[in-house]
């Protein structure tokens, strides 16, 4: 299980998730429990998909941010984050 924290000036969400999928300058990345630690810049307008414990998938769009992942803890921080 991954603990995902989503933070922006107007939003703060904490979710337990199974996986997280994102597009990065290096290509598409799927993060699952035990993934190698990483720190990724997020391009404006990038979207993320993540899967909750119950199998429901959620989509978010981010502007000007980054993703940090280490020890099954993910933190997504952005100037503007929108649930879509």
Give the ranges of each region predicted by the language model:
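Compact, glycine-rich, soluble single-domain proteins
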Residues: 2-84
């Amino acid at each position: 299980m991954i603990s995902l924290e989503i933070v922006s000036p107007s939003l703060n969400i904490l979710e337990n998730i199974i996986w997280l999928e994102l597009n990065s300058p290096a290509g598409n990345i799927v993060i699952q429990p035990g993934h190698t630690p990483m720190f990724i810049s997020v391009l404006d307008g990038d979207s993320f998909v993540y899967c909750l414990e119950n199998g429901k998938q959620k989509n978010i769009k981010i502007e000007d941010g980054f993703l940090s992942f280490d020890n099954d803890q993910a933190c997504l921080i952005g100037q503007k984050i929108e649930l879509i």
